[in-house]
A protein has these predicted regions:
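Aromatic- and carboxylate-enriched substrate-binding clefts and catalytic-loop regions
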Residues: 83-183
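Conserved structural scaffold segments of CAZyme catalytic domains across common CAZy folds
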Residues: 1-110, 116
Length: 183
């Protein structure tokens, strides 16, 4: 096999260390890959806390999430990810107050969303925001306006071209509103 020049190949990297620090703080993926699309905003990567990994769905409530904001602040972390059910357990109407509290501690917030769509039958909310471009853009405008820093979009239906287009559409719309994205 040959490679026409100038050529490129996908990068594969492994990061190892005696503790988690070099793994979570590595910048290798950003150092070796040129961005496919330019962004309108400058984004700051950082560390965060996430209650769901330990406490699961029951932790998605105002009081427990405040504890995670306090933990992030005490550790000097930049972010807290609030997982599924935030829309019902904390409430959209209370989210601005919650974000104001987080900002008072110098912590930013990521919120979880289902990718939704016909392929997706999960019940965890919020659902039906990310698969429709009109609804998605309206939601991202709201997120930006209340001070959310990013979103985690979860439960995609495979890796077909349609799904890859949805990934790109979410990234493009998020960039229009200055939101970072975790998939």
């Amino acid at each position: 096999p040959g490679l026409a020049l100038p050529g490129s190949t996908p990068w594969r990297t492994i990061t190892v260390g005696e503790n988690l620090k070099p793994i979570v703080e590595t910048t290798i993926p950003w150092d070796v890959v040129e961005p496919l699309y330019p962004t309108e905003h400058t984004y700051k990567m950082g560390r965060g806390t996430w209650s769901w990994i330990l406490w699961q769905d029951g932790s998605i409530n105002f009081d427990d999430q405040k504890k995670y904001v306090d933990l992030a602040a005490a550790m000097g972390y930049e972010y807290v990810l609030i997982d599924n059910w935030w829309d019902t357990n904390i409430g959209r109407e209370r989210m601005k107050d919650f974000i104001d509290y987080a900002h008072s501690k110098k912590v930013d917030i990521f919120l979880w969303y289902s990718s939704s769509g016909y392929w997706n039958d999960i019940v965890q909310g919020p659902t039906n925001y990310m698969d429709n471009p009109i609804i998605r853009k309206k939601e991202m405008k709201w997120l930006h306006n209340i001070g959310v820093k990013g979103i985690k979009v979860d439960f995609f239906g495979g890796d077909k071209q349609e799904t890859m287009r949805l990934y790109e559409a979410i990234l493009s719309d998020a960039d229009d509103h200055g939101l970072m994205v975790i998939f």
